[in-house]
Regions:
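Hydrophobic "lid"/C-terminal helical patch
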Residues: 87, 91, 292, 296, ...
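Flexible "cap/lid" subdomain of the alpha/beta-hydrolase fold that forms the substrate-access gate
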Residues: 2, 13-15, 40, 59, ...
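Proline-centered flexible-loop/turn and helix-kink motifs
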Residues: 35, 54, 121-122, 270, ...
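Hydrophobic residues on the short alpha-helix immediately C-terminal to a glycine-rich phosphate/catalytic loop
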Residues: 44, 116, 295-299
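Alpha/beta-hydrolase fold catalytic core
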Residues: 1-28, 49-57, 270, 297-302
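Conserved HGGG/HGGXW glycine-rich cap/lid loop of the alpha/beta-hydrolase fold
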Residues: 18-70
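Residues at the C-termini of beta-strands that transition into short coil/loop
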Residues: 8, 21, 62, 131, ...
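Catalytic histidine-centered segment of alpha/beta-hydrolase-like enzymes
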Residues: 280-289, 293
């Protein structure tokens, strides 16, 4: 059974969390992306909390800026170092003294998780990434690939000062398109039911500014005539290496994050298991949640 708890962290941030399983069991954290919230993990929280699937203590926070968690007004509060700090503090607040058994993440949650694994490999046994680019390959593609620049052009829309207003128009029409453009309502793995829409509306009606501030705080976006963005960035090698066993699950039909982003990933992640799902899109957790769970189970049982 899923339960909710708000946790106050020592640095002044509070995170609303969804959780399943018994505190004290090996801890697995799940980090959502944009424009989602912790509820997207409910099926996996329940699955991995069950004794026959490992009996983990499974926790999914609403990241800062989302769905009742703290939403600082300063855009700089959404930089990676602060987001990683939240997860380190959350681990401690949950009473976990051992390394995390697993950190599972998608989209923006993956950006946080890649950084966490780079900075704190001693706090983590295994990393699972679902359609979230490693900063090294993402920077390379944003600089050199016209296709990736086009695929990521929406980022420059999301940093507009009026993005919140535009996204909320006409019952969030533009936000629904993030899903329906990849078959969420009509594809072979359609998942965007009326009930799911109600869950999203409940999140979005609490405000969009925190979620959009992730994009505003990051220079990893396509360059424009008036903004060099990614072209102005160089990331040192020590910020890119991930020295924990990592499973990357990639939906190959992701129109925002195409497969070029997984090329050369092994240069940054020596212990890499890569599983490509040919018909999958960016929304794999919705489309094929139990297939994702099965791949994770094999990885965690290794």
């Amino acid at each position: 059974m899923i339960r909710e708890q708000r946790l106050d962290l020592p640095h002044g941030i509070s995170l609303n969390c969804r959780m399943a399983g018994a505190p004290g069991q090996p801890l697995m954290l799940f980090l959502h992306g944009f424009p989602e919230a912790a509820f997207v993990w409910d099926e996996l929280l329940t699955h991995f909390s069950q004794a026959e699937h490992g009996g983990y203590f499974c926790v999914a926070p609403n990241l800062r800026g989302y769905a009742g968690s703290s939403s600082p007004t300063d855009v700089s509060a959404y930089r990676a170092k602060h987001l990683v700090q939240d997860i380190v503090a959350l681990k401690t607040a949950l009473g976990c003294k051992d390394p995390l058994s697993g950190l599972v993440a998608h989209d923006w949650g993956g950006a946080v998780a890649w950084n966490f694994a780079n900075q704190h490999p001693d706090l983590l046994h295994k990393l699972v990434i679902i359609n979230s680019p490693h900063p090294g390959t993402f920077l390379r593609e944003l600089k050199s690939s016209a296709a990736q620049q086009a695929s990521s052009a929406y980022m420059n829309f999301l940093i507009r000062p009026d993005a919140e207003t535009l996204l909320a128009e006409d019952d969030f029409r533009r936000l629904w398109a993030f899903f329906t453009n990849m078959g969420a309502d009509t594809g072979p793995h359609a998942w965007l039911t009326a009930a799911e829409k109600d869950k999203y509306r409940a999140v979005w009606n609490q405000g969009l500014t925190g979620a959009l501030n992730y994009y505003r705080a990051s220079p990893l976006r396509p360059p424009r005539a008036d903004d060099p963005a990614a072209q102005a960035i160089t990331l040192p090698a020590e910020m890119l290496q991930v020295n924990v066993p990592t499973l990357v699950i990639w939906g190959m039909q992701d129109i925002a994050l195409p497969p070029g982003l997984i090329e050369g990933l092994e240069a940054y992640v020596p212990d890499l298991t890569l599983h490509e799902i040919e018909e999958g899109t960016h929304w794999l957790v919705h489309e094929q949640g139990m297939r994702v769970a099965g791949l994770m189970q094999v990885f965690f049982n290794r």
